[in-house]
């Protein structure tokens, strides 16, 4: 169908217009970052409805996430409603408003689930199936692998024995089990998993495939050997310019002769390479040689570096690719074939048994969704089924978003329900292969690349390709820098796609013309003499300074109004490859009081509150685990002190378990009686919880622990209380989810948690920060995909690529299969096989390619300005970086494949042709926009030494002044003088705050307000606070005289803390028995009973308030809290006083869903003549109004609910607030 002519004045670019209307064949839209692909996709759907009259439920729209699906459906629904309002008589539009709710705009998994629900009879499964949780799936798969391995241990096939000896250790078979698990996940990402597993052995048996692998390694070796020869020749040329280096030249001449033989005839002579030694040692560069070439010091160093580079490149070929002769590599393949075949058999057994278990439990996982859908849509010969044909008739177009993240199974499903071939099909695909960063989820970017290379711009004879290259997100400096980097870094060899004119980004956003250069910051670490911080901590502190600089100096441009506003916290994001730097950043931002949030799915199990609950669960499951038992004892719940634990252990130093030591201590006559009682209560708790866990699910056990010990309340009152509370509820909810699976019990739940921790999986800290909250954010590049921020700080660039998987004994690859090292069982030695070497080389190339794509995603998140943060150890590392500058179109393939981290790649590109002669002892700034080559982007490269970075002042351009500018300052600059005077005259605006303590009790706040109202200075209250003693009165003073009033008050509060609330009021006799019990338990002293005002307590027991509490649903006693005063005072943003309130609430109860607090008062007061009870009550309320206000606001802040309160005076009665 012909694309309609684009009218004048429409907002769409030509490429977007084509993307909206192109039809009649399969269409692939290569949509670069920020090119408006979502808007185009929505507009295409709308035009299908409005222009072509297609019903919305006859379109299948596939998105990558459920969130994307909801957002897209919402956008489409809005547009339909707008069109319907504009044309109310249009019956077709009215129908669409109804049909939008049945429209298939979803993830492919959701579509597959719907397919299964409608056609379960084809699969012969129970229609009442449910989807298994991740917990259930992990445990069931682990259980299946264990059982299958045990079965094969019974068989003891020779190939199985060899496998276990190769892949297991003397202590465990964890590695063997992990490989089986990985193979399972790789296999089910294919349309026919069994067939994929069967083909794993083919390269080990067929010589033709082995020859292909040899050729692959030979071609790759040629790249490195050619680069090595170039480096060798450069070293020779440099040494030839010098005096006194004849011996050096002789060594290099010999190496050149050897290399010439290897490269003779344009081919790589691998046998000659493996048979001879290369890289002879160069003679030392003596002081005499340096003196003779004193004018060529840099050239001398460069010559040595070039020879070092030559050696490293040759070593890589000889060590990584051809450490053994090709014939030996082939011979090992034949011996490995039975092991590979048997390993595939084990995985097939796991797959079969795992499927059987899932069917018996009537559960499905996400892999089942895809494979069952494929089973419904295909016949046994792989051709589309009748059901597939019906879907082909129903769906008039299939639209796929994020096509670059599709896998082979999903591709097969789409091919079953699409119509026609590529030249006349109805499949519309949108994506950007440069943003394919989900290979760990088995995404296969080659599907996109194959179509991109096959489809044409005009679509003649095949599918149509449309390039959306105009970026509407970023300033031109961000785009030109991104283009410049990737023009030199990415091509088909490394990166898997050519970054040419069609792939690059074109400026399309309506920004003004102001200058916003990209900033590349190179941080040189301070050594231990200059800083106690690690390199990572130094980088974190430096990032904070960059944030402060942005907040003070940068503005955000509003495209709609054409005006600027000040930068805020939420405008800034810090992107990293992983969350490894999160803790350092959190601490650094905390030190500067900058609101900061880590958008993390990691670190959950490291949170204090979560570790406490897990220690509790582990101790209940098995108290013989010392770490968890002692951890629970030392926690805020039980509060055993270190010296108490020492006493216990000293008495039984040879016990195997601390639990045994506790029991022995309790039974020892010489033991401290108070500690024995404390231990008895602790063991009683443990035994009680153990008994409870036998009859109740895990989530109820956790809930009981929370309620018994006020865990939620305690952690809610700490700094970060909202997040801590969310974490605790998150663990509770996970326990509920776990209990809803087919697994039960505390042991299984702990096993599940251990499995997640071992695999590096996290629930993630519960997110309590919304998208509009004004905080600086840190997130991984993966989680930032699809988002945009005015200011992006891309840090962690110097962190090395994670190549851990390349060191495993088994390398997996979707295209090639399985590469296994050869293990000589007799010699117990492992050797690289042809397959393991070749697949490792392929995996390394794919890994670096994906890391490049991650860099692309990170750079293209920035709207206003981009900051790139690299870090080097010292000046020597900086000098080596300078040597990386390139002069060609691309960085050499070998340089890219061996680059340790993104920073090496980025710096080598952006520092191209830059002078390395600036003195190292000066901070400097190199603006590569000033270089004559006009194609260069606008980038500032700054070298910063950490010891020069002040963590108290903001780094600005003054930190990088040239020598001339410094001289001008010395001669006297009026601006500088004015600045100095301004700083000396500066008056600190918050002087009063320096006189206030950072932490105050509620009682102190009450005194503060009372003194302010009476005209007394706060300093006197502060002096009172400092002088007030909280230590207990020594026994010798207690024994000599009566208790003081405040001590009696404390005693009365202690009695009330433990007082039972019964619907049938306790009698005076029972009260005496209860107090005797407190004495027996050493809660109060033996002589305290005489000072307890029994009559006043009985008056309370007979009061209405006692009855109300006795009938309450929940009662909590003596609740401590710590809360930010700004939150309690509900201060506006920016007026927050950094002051913490701490206190203790006597009692809280919940009745009819409402929370009430009670505060007991032992005050003595004089009843003035003629004063009524009402007047006395008003006077008492006024006296404590400040304190009660803080209690009420604190609880409302913590609970997020309305709270009411009571004051109870033992000498007056009840006052309701």
UniProtKB/Swiss-Prot annotation:
Gene3D superfamilies: 3.90.320.10, P-loop containing nucleotide triphosphate hydrolases, PCRA, domain 4. Residues 10-475 form the UvrD-like helicase ATP-binding domain. Its cofactor is Mg(2+). CDD domains: DEXQc_UvrD. The keyword Mitochondrion does not apply. ATP binds at residues 31-38. InterPro entries: AddA (IPR014152), DNA_helicase_UvrD-like_C (IPR014017), DNA_helicase_UvrD/REP (IPR000212), P-loop_NTPase (IPR027417), PDDEXK-like_dom_sf (IPR011604), PDDEXK_AddAB-type (IPR038726), Restrct_endonuc-II-like (IPR011335), UvrD-like_ATP-bd (IPR014016). Residues 476-786 form the UvrD-like helicase C-terminal domain. One of its GO terms (biological process) is double-strand break repair via homologous recombination. It catalyses: Couples ATP hydrolysis with the unwinding of duplex DNA by translocating in the 3'-5' direction; ATP + H2O = ADP + phosphate + H(+). PROSITE patterns: UVRD_HELICASE_ATP_BIND (PS51198), UVRD_HELICASE_CTER (PS51217). Belongs to the helicase family. AddA subfamily. NCBIfam families: addA_Gpos. PANTHER family: ATP-DEPENDENT HELICASE_NUCLEASE SUBUNIT A (PTHR11070:SF48), UVRD / RECB / PCRA DNA HELICASE FAMILY MEMBER (PTHR11070). This is ATP-dependent helicase/nuclease subunit A. It comes from Staphylococcus aureus (strain JH9).
